[in-house]
Structures are given as structure tokens and as C-alpha cells.
């Protein structure tokens, strides 16, 4: 488990959680004596019964490369799976074995970076090749420079084992998060309003907001493509707070001064509101009638208004409708 599966965090979900089933699933794991390895800087990032491998933050890819090197050089790789279900392994192998850059990504190389002993890396490589193995990567690993690499490497490692698609094997991202990723729950579609088609196809990865604001017009790579950062003059932010989840907040605070105008919908005087030129006060869930649907539970919950909206606060849909009317594009 890269990044672990924190039992406390798994009880929290946007939109709420009703069943709270993860503890029961963790217990089933322990009852079956399944070996859980928590690879994380924090020991608490895993359910009870897990073994802990403390790792230097941000070095998960190096650790996985060390395992991959052992699998390749000890011929523990599922060659048939790689041949039939993947593309590009031979090019990856040139990098892994050092034929491309002169540096084999062996266990000793990985130990110097990630802090986990070469002996442990070799032992894990043999163990996961001999048993049914599920590799999980927490969502948190993406929130770093080159944050996509652990996910690419974990997928590569799972492909080398050849267990993708087998019961209890393969690869999983975000297991245990938001109340049940990975649990066998049948969801149904949510209630939505009709929406038009966005004529703008450009986008940036969410973790590059500060970089975009600081470097308009510069190039960046994403999923093998070269893109260009736009020159943003106005930000209108609703339904979230970039100062809650963005990395390097001091850098973001300085970058946030670049645009000419910043507008936000918010219900409290938080960091985003304090750094906005215009704040449109919106209601909380206690000030409107609504419907709640949890993302991982098959439930619809009726939400009855408890109090009238405070002051001039309006719900987000009323705000959007009012703006659309002023712009002459109200549906």
C-alpha cells in the first residue's frame, strides 16, 4: 500500500458517508491473514495488522523501480502478460537496467533514495512475484512535483507481475478513500441539470495552478503532450478552495496576486475569500432544500432547510442564473 489506507480518513467522504463499511472489510483482511504492507512516512496510515515500511516522502517511484529491477534480473516477470497486454516494456527495460543512462535501478540505488534497505527491497520483489498481489496507491502521492510517476510506475509493476484482472491482484488507486473505493457497491446515477458543451478544450492539471499563474505562455508536458500555459486575467472560483488542497501554499499566495480580478462564491471568510476582489455570498447546506447523494453508498437523502439564508446569501444556482441573466444568456 503506497501511501497506506488511513482508517480514520476512510470514514470521511464528500457528500457524506452512511454505511461506514471499511472497518468491516479491514477485519476480513485480518481474519484471512492477508499480508498488508504500509509503505508510508506515517505508521498510522494503515489499518491494524499491517506491517510498516517508513519511506522518504516523494520517493515511492524509486522504491518501485528497485523492486522492478529485481523482478527483471531474476526473471520473475510475466513475459507472456507483457507481450499480450502491454506496449513499450522493452523501452522501459533499457532505463530500468541502466542501458539508457548507465545507472541500473537496482536495490542499492533505490535504498539511497527511499531509505528502505536493499535487502528488504529484494525480499519484497520475490514475495510479490510468488503470491497474489494487489498494489494500491493512495491519491495523496499525486500532490507533488512529478506526482504522476508513482501511478505510472505502479501500473508498470503490476503489469510485470501479470496479475491485472485476477481476483485479489493487479492495481488500485485510492482504495479505502471517501468511504469505500474498491468496495463492491453498486452505485446509481446522480441527479443533474442539463448542461451545454464547453467550447474551450484547454485545461491544466489541478496541481499546476501556481505554475500556470507564474509562467503564462511557457510550455509544459502532460501525458506525453506538450501544452502551453494560458495568460489568466480573471479567476472565478466556486465550490472549492485552492488554498485547502494545493501544494506549496506560500508559492500559491504569491501567484494568486498575478490575475487582474478574482471572484469567488463562498459562505465564510476563508483564505480564498480573503484573497478575492469580489466575494458572492452563497448559502450553506443548512439554508436550502436539497438532495444529498453519497458517492459510495446507494442512498438518496432528503435535506430540509433549517434556517433562512443569512443576509444577501443565495445558493450557487441562483448566483449563476443571475449572472447568466445579466450576460443575456439565461436559458
Task: Label each region the model flagged.
Residues 277:
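Catalytic, metal-anchored helix/loop core of enzyme active sites in primary metabolism
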Residues 286-309, 320, 324, 329:
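Glycine/threonine-rich phosphate-binding loop and adjacent beta-strand/alpha-helix elements that clamp
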Residues 44-48, 100-106, 131-137, 231-233, ...:
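Short acidic (Asp/Glu) and glycine-rich catalytic loops that position anionic groups and cofactors
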Residues 88-214:
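Active-site phosphate/pyrophosphate-binding segments
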Residues 15, 53-58, 82, 100, ...:
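Hydrophobic alpha-helical scaffolding
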Residues 1-39, 61-65, 159-274, 284-291, ...:
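Extended redox/cofactor-interaction regions of prokaryotic respiratory oxidoreductases
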Residues 77-79, 121, 135-136, 163-173, ...:
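Acidic/polar loop patches that form or flank catalytic/metal-binding clefts of enzymes
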Amino acid at each position: 500500500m503506497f501511501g497506506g489506507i488511513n482508517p480514520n480518513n476512510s470514514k470521511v467522504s464528500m457528500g457524506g458517508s452512511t454505511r461506514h463499511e471499511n472497518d468491516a472489510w479491514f477485519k476480513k483482511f485480518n481474519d484471512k491473514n492477508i499480508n498488508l504492507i504500509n509503505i508510508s512516512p506515517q505508521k498510522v496510515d494503515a489499518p491494524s495488522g499491517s506491517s510498516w515500511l517508513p519511506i522518504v516522502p516523494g520517493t515511492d517511484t524509486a522504491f518501485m523501480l528497485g523492486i522492478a529491477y529485481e523482478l527483471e534480473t531474476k526473471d520473475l516477470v510475466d513475459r507472456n502478460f507483457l507481450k499480450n497486454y502491454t506496449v513499450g516494456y522493452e523501452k522501459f527495460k533499457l532505463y530500468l537496467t541502466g542501458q539508457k543512462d548507465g545507472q541500473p535501478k537496482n536495490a542499492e540505488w533505490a535504498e539511497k533514495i527511499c531509505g528502505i534497505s536493499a535487502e528488504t527491497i529484494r525480499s519484497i520483489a520475490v514475495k510479490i512475484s510468488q503470491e497474489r498481489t494487489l498494489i494500491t496507491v493512495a491519491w495523496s502521492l499525486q500532490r507533488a512535483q512529478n506526482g504522476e510517476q508513482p501511478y505510472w510506475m505502479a501500473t508498470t509493476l503490476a503489469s510485470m507481475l501479470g496479475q491485472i484482472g485476477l481476483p485479489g491482484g493487479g492495481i488500485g488507486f485510492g482504495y479505502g478513500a471517501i468511504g469505500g473505493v474498491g468496495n463492491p457497491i453498486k452505485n446509481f446515477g446522480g441527479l443533474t441539470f442539463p448542461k451545454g458543451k464547453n467550447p474551450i478544450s484547454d485545461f491544466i492539471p489541478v496541481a499546476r495552478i501556481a505554475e500556470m499563474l507564474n509562467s503564462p505562455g511557457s510550455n509544459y508536458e502532460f501525458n506525453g503532450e506538450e501544452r502551453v500555459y494560458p495568460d489568466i486575467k480573471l479567476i472565478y472560483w466556486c465550490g472549492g478552495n485552492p488554498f485547502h488542497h494545493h501544494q506549496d501554499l506560500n508559492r500559491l499566495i504569491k501567484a494568486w496576486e498575478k490575475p487582474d480580478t478574482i471572484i469567488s462564491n463562498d459562505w465564510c471568510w476563508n483564505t480564498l475569500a480573503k484573497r478575492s476582489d469580489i466575494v458572492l455570498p452563497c448559502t450553506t447546506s443548512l439554508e436550502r432544500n436539497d438532495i444529498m447523494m453519497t458517492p459510495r453508498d446507494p442512498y438518496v437523502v432528503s435535506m430540509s432547510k433549517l434556517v433562512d439564508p443569512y443576509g444577501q446569501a443565495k445558493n450557487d444556482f441562483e448566483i449563476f442564473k443571475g449572472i447568466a441573466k445579466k450576460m443575456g444568456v439565461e436559458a
